[in-house]
């Protein structure tokens, strides 16, 4: 797409926007979407190959999702996880069954959870939880976490420490202790990195 002024037809000047410029300052403002297509405030059409940084693959303005959200908003929005909600229970059961290969269990068959589900907002939070569980459940105070070089696990401090990208650590030093990194596809290096304080090996097969 051709470059254009940051002064949008909507009257919003992105050069004076108070949103923190975590990445390069945006010069496009999206105002509408349908399926895989997006339109900016200049009326130009784009194909969305990003999907909310690979976390939203259901398309924009999905009518089924819109209707479900509207229906739920008329009943209950968010409550603390101090209490149970119907949908959280059903999703947790579905996840547990999917992970353990019991999605096609006969109707009415007995069900007993094989594990536990913790809902959170992002992959970084999920990784933080994994580190905490590994440390809390490890015997004799083990705390070390081994990850791969050039990996990415999130932007929160411990998740960032797990990333095998030293240049991303430098602006936030000192990083949390206990994280080490080995080259991918080097089993010998991985085995050598394991020692008496290792609590977990944290690898993402797809990066």
Which residues does each predicted region cover?
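Electropositive phosphate-/nucleotide-binding environments in soluble metabolic enzymes
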Residues: 9, 28-32, 59, 63, ...
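Residue-level signal for pocket-adjacent positions within structured domains
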Residues: 18, 23-25, 48-53, 71, ...
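PLP-dependent aspartate aminotransferase-fold enzymes
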Residues: 96-203
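Active-site core of PLP-dependent enzymes with the aminotransferase class I/II
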Residues: 206-207
């Amino acid at each position: 797409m051709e470059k254009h002024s940051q002064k949008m037809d909507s009257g919003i000047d992105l050069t004076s926007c108070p949103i923190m410029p975590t990445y390069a300052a945006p010069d496009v403002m999206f105002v509408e979407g349908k399926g895989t297509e997006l339109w900016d405030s200049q009326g130009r059409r784009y194909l969305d190959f990003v999907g909310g940084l690979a976390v939203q693959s259901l398309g924009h303005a999905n009518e089924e999702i819109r209707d479900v959200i509207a229906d739920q908003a008329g009943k209950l929005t968010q409550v603390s996880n101090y209490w149970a909600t119907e949908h959280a229970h059903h999703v947790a059961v579905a996840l547990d069954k999917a992970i353990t290969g019991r999605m096609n269990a006969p109707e009415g068959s007995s069900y007993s959870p094989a594990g536990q589900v913790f809902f959170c907002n992002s992959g970084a939070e999920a990784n933080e939880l994994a580190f905490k569980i590994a440390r809390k459940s490890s015997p004799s105070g083990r705390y070390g976490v081994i990850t791969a070089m050039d990996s990415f696990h999130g932007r929160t401090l411990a998740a960032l420490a797990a990333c095998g990208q030293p240049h991303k650590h430098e602006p936030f030093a000192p990083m949390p202790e206990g994280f080490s990194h080995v080259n991918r596809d080097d089993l010998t290096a991985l085995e050598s990195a394991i020692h008496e304080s290792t609590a977990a090996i944290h690898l993402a097969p797809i990066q």
